[in-house]
């Protein structure tokens, strides 16, 4: 089978989860992605065949980049067609992002069994373009806003083995002892979290602050100033552009402060941790708000819109969780109830069913 995924953790982590499941079922798995996506392939099983393909986006870059984009995509489609003729996949699964265009387009032209998985509550641009050109759509967030006449199947968002192994891990509620707070802005970090979270934490009462240890994922360009701010304000913090061990840190955390990308919400709910979610306001179709809504309504998270995410507002919410162990425990339990640890297996069954149907036609 072939998996195609775009260049962010939001696309790559669920793709990794499916690769792990399909390899365990005895499948040969190939992944196609771009150079950005290749940064996230370190966690994929070693037996996954990984190929970087030519693709481009119309959403970023200047006029020159937009002129070149169709030619890059066309070259990627041609390469995918040639590759599929040499090694015909039984099924092609796209996880969104521009790097999935070549594989999905080639699968459409060759009439191969094909499907997409949409992690968010709103279809991304590429998944929207292919929604009526695939055999099935798996949805990670429910309900998902789908084009008229298009049906989706709710599988949930698959999570990596490292997350699944920690499903409903025991939660230590906040108290007068060392506490962990994890701050993650998605796989690419988030500037607003680097702007508002450090002063919010630094303003907490000293009795609470002395117990806190912060793990803060910040962008490369923000790392130094964030680390300096924490140090100057007496906050124990580890600041890195990317944590390879997020599953461990999330499991040990009393509170997680995060964007509400679909993968982050899935990880939080499978492990079961209280969270403060700050949806990315510029996300396509405001899909991060849609992603957060279910977990918030279930009682597992607090949502703070980006427009209201001041240091004062965040400090109040952080304090409300860490100063109330009973409420924090209830949030952790609610998050775990909301989780769908079976999502990976459901998606794997869907993939196998589609491949089987393709063999009969």
Swiss-Prot record:
GO terms for cellular component: plasma membrane. GO terms for biological process: carbohydrate metabolic process; cell division; cell wall organization; lipid glycosylation; peptidoglycan biosynthetic process; regulation of cell shape. Its main location: membrane. It is found in: Cell inner membrane. Its EC number is 2.4.1.227. UDP-N-acetyl-alpha-D-glucosamine binds at residues 8-10, 120, 160, 187, 288. Signal peptide: none annotated. Cell wall formation. Catalyzes the transfer of a GlcNAc subunit on undecaprenyl-pyrophosphoryl-MurNAc-pentapeptide (lipid intermediate I) to form undecaprenyl-pyrophosphoryl-MurNAc-(pentapeptide)GlcNAc (lipid intermediate II). Belongs to the glycosyltransferase 28 family. MurG subfamily. This is UDP-N-acetylglucosamine--N-acetylmuramyl-(pentapeptide) pyrophosphoryl-undecaprenol N-acetylglucosamine transferase. The gene is murG.
């Amino acid at each position: 089978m072939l998996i195609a995924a775009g260049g962010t953790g939001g696309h790559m982590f669920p793709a990794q989860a499916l690769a792990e499941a399909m390899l365990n079922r005895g499948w040969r798995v190939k992944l196609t992605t771009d150079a950005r996506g290749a940064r996230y392939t370190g966690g994929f099983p070693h037996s996954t065949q990984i190929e970087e393909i030519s693709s481009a986006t119309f959403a970023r870059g200047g006029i020159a980049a937009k002129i070149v984009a169709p030619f890059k995509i066309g070259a990627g489609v041609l390469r995918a067609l040639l590759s599929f003729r040499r090694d015909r996949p039984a099924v092609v699964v796209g996880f969104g992002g521009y790097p999935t265009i070549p594989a999905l387009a080639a699968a459409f032209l060759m009439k191969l069994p094909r499907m997409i998985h949409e992690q968010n509550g709103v279809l991304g641009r590429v998944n929207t373009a292919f929604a009526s050109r695939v055999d099935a759509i798996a949805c990670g967030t429910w309900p998902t806003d789908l084009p008229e006449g298009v049906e989706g199947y709710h599988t949930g968002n698959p999570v990596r083995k490292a997350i699944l192994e920690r499903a409903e891990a025991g939660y230590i509620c906040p108290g007068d002892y060392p506490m962990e707070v994890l701050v993650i802005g998605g796989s690419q970090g988030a500037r607003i979290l680097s702007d508002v979270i450090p002063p919010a934490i630094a303003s907490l009462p000293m009795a609470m602050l002395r117990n806190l240890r912060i793990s803060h994922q910040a962008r490369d360009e923000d790392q130094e100033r964030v680390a300096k701010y924490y140090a100057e304000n007496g906050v124990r913090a580890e600041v890195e552009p990317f944590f390879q061990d997020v599953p461990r840190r999330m499991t040990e955390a009393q509170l997680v402060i995060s964007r509400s990308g679909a993968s982050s919400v899935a990880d939080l709910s499978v492990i079961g941790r209280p969270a403060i979610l700050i949806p990315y306001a510029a996300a396509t179709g405001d899909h991060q708000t849609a992603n957060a809504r279910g977990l918030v309504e279930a009682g597992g998270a607090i949502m703070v819109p980006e427009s209201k995410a001041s240091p004062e507002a965040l400090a109040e919410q952080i304090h409300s969780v860490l100063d109330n162990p009973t409420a924090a425990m209830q949030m952790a339990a609610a998050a775990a109830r909301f989780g769908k640890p079976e999502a990976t297996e459901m998606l794997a069954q869907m993939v196998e069913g589609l491949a089987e149907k393709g063999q009969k036609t």
